Regions:
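Short beta-strand scaffold segments in enzyme catalytic cores
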Residues: 82-84, 95-98, 129, 194, ...
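Short polar catalytic/cofactor-binding loops
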Residues: 8-14
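Active-site catalytic loop in hydrolytic enzyme cores
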Residues: 58, 87-160, 176-179, 183, ...
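Cys-nucleophile CN-hydrolase/nitrilase-fold catalytic domain and related Cys-dependent amidase chemistry
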Residues: 24-101, 105, 171-188
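CN hydrolase (nitrilase-like) catalytic-core segments centered on the catalytic cysteine
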Residues: 64-79, 149-234
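Residue-level detector of high-confidence beta-strand sites
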Residues: 95, 107-109, 167, 227-229, ...
Length: 265
């Protein structure tokens, strides 16, 4: 049995240090083994250009956000999955970093860029990664926001042993991503933690993004274990019985992984 948590925040665009300080403060309200933060929780979302995006992105080696998260995970003896703008070799990526007890396990770079993200970020070829958390004997998979739309992504992670899907998000389609992740959890028999943000950003003459909140943790049985409201910054945690995610039988005769007919898909 482990504990998982989401951290629902409202970042202010461009105020990286303040955003991370606030996010960590919110997370400190609960005790958990895994904390999931929203997509781009360090920078905010609505960039005006690729140049602006790159100027706010940070490298893993010297990033202010990463260092703050490392300090938090060392102090709390926990793991963080957090969405941030990452720069590497002259390119910016919409990424999530995984940090366990001060150690960077790696990053996942978003495979399915949403809408204007295609103008800001470089395309990722990272594939869908799982990360083993030795401290709690748990394997997690990482998705970012719009990845939920593609069931193949969640299935790939489940096939690679993920027991918990960590889903940093800036969801703007009301209720769609949250409902989709209920299905992803059920069809793959995994837990899913969606950490969404709240508020809105209007940084251009035509674009206004309103984020839908309703962060959630759902079970392999398609049950919402804990949720947030549409508005309000909050962290919530609950217990996750990993044995439920390790049992892949829909019936006594049907293993959802072994019964796949992958040759025909």
């Amino acid at each position: 049995m482990i504990r998982g948590a989401f951290v629902q925040t409202r970042p202010i665009f461009g105020e990286v240090e303040k955003n991370i300080e606030n996010a960590v403060k919110i997370a400190s309200q609960v005790n958990s083994d895994i904390y999931v933060f929203p997509e781009l929780c360090n920078t905010g979302y609505a960039f005006r250009s690729r140049k602006e995006c790159f100027s706010l992105a940070e490298s893993l080696d010297h990033g202010r956000s990463v260092e703050k998260f490392q300090e938090f995970t060392e102090k709390k003896k926990c793991t963080i999955v957090a969405g941030l703008a990452e720069k590497d070799r002259g390119r910016a990526y919409n990424s999530s970093v995984v940090i366990e007890r001060g150690r960077i396990l790696g990053t996942y770079r978003k495979m399915h860029l949403f809408y204007r993200e295609k103008l800001w970020f470089s395309k990722s070829y990272s594939g869908f990664k799982t990360f083993y958390l030795d401290s709690i004997d748990c394997r997690i998979g990482v998705l970012i926001c719009f990845d939920w739309m593609f069931p193949e992504a969640s299935r790939k992670l489940a096939m690679n042993g993920a027991e918990v899907l960590c889903h940093p998000s800036d969801l703007v389609l009301p209720g769609k991503g949250q409902t989709g992740m209920l299905v992803r959890a059920f069809e793959n028999h995994v837990f899913a933690i969606t950490a969404n943000r709240i508020g809105y950003e209007n940084r251009g003459p035509k674009e206004k993004f309103r984020f839908t909140g309703y962060s959630q943790i759902v079970s392999p049985k398609m049950k919402k274990l804990v949720t947030a409201e549409r508005n309000g910054v909050v962290a919530k945690a609950t217990r996750l019985d990993l044995e439920l995610a390790r049992k892949k039988f829909a019936t006594s005769a049907n293993n959802i992984i072994e019964d796949m007919r992958a040759d025909f898909y």
